[in-house]
Amino acid sequence: MEFWGLEVKPGSTVKCEPGHGFILHVSQAALGESKKSDSALMYVKVDDKKLAIGTLSIDKYPQIQFDLVFNKEFELSHTSKTTSVFFSGYKVEQPIEGDEMDLDSEDEEEELNIPVIKENGKADGKEEQKNQEKAVAATASKSSLGLEKKSKDDSDDSDEDESDDSDEDDSDDSDEGEGLSPDEGDDDSSDEDDTSDDDEEETPTPKKPEAGKKRGAENALKTPLSDKKAKVATPPAQKTGGKKGATHVATPHPAKGKTPANNDKLTEKSPKSGGSVPCKSCSKTFNSEMALQAHSKAKHGAK
């Protein structure tokens, strides 16, 4: 900052120049010594424009304070014919916007670009670049390992969920297979009733042993329509004539269209004689053990 001041004599005009790179602040104006009461109206002219900035009076306002800022040439004048007017202020350097921006950018570049200096005092830019590349590669490898591990964990979880779902489906299917629908039960009971009725009608006139074989084949062919009913085994036959009947008959899948493998064995073990077999629960008699079993299961719920 630099002090500034000048005198404007009566009837004269003074040009003022702030100077290159400076700003001029006019902060005060005062009247000089005078023996008569006098007043002065002050003017400033900038770019062909003349403006009044104040009035000085020895009796009332011998001085005035203000703050006028000029960055280019201007002119000062007043109307007093007997007394001079003194102006005072100060000058400061005007900052350049481009220089400030350049200084800031240079400081930032110096902070960012700090080279590695060896013992011999020379900067080693290649070594710094290699270190940066190594750091970037290490970070990338860690991130890729983390992603692979996460994807592996997700796949394991999905496999476990699928296995659990399949186990639940299998258990549901097995539970459904164990129970029989009412329609299937009705079909079986109706078939057994028909068989028992046929046996009752044929009881008075027993025929050749071949009739028992045919009935055994018919009963063997009446297998359940669902593959789930194949799990139910036929009950063991009662002892007739000191011999045991077939203990278990497994029925094949109906889709294959084959008759049971042990069909011949069942027919062979059926009674060959035309004698009657009485029911222990009621007074009815049957001409074969198979007919008695079908009757007992249908009428008396034998297991």
Curated annotation (Swiss-Prot):
Biased composition regions of type Basic and acidic residues, renumbered to the chain: 119-133, 204-217
Signal peptide residues on this chain, from the entry's feature table: none
Keywords per UniProt: Chromatin regulator, Hydrolase, Metal-binding, Nucleus, Phosphoprotein, Repressor, Transcription, Transcription regulation, Zinc, Zinc-finger
Biased composition (Acidic residues): 100-112, 154-203
Superkingdom: Eukaryota
Keyword Amino-acid biosynthesis: no
GO terms (BP aspect): chromatin organization
Any one GO molecular-function label of the UniProt entry: hydrolase activity
Region (Disordered): 100-282
Keyword S-adenosyl-L-methionine assigned: no
One GO cellular component, as annotated: nucleolus
Zinc finger (C2H2-type): 277-300
Localization annotation: Nucleus, Nucleolus
InterPro entries in the record: NPL, Znf_C2H2_type
Pfam family, one: NPL
Main location: nucleus
Gene3D superfamilies linked to this entry: Nucleoplasmin core domain
Subunit details: Multimer. Possibly forms a homotrimer with HDT1 and/or HDT3.
Family: Belongs to the histone deacetylase HD2 family.
Function: Mediates the deacetylation of lysine residues on the N-terminal part of the core histones (H2A, H2B, H3 and H4). Histone deacetylation gives a tag for epigenetic repression and plays an important role in transcriptional regulation, cell cycle progression and developmental events.
Protein name, per record: Histone deacetylase HDT2
Gene name of the encoded protein: HDT2
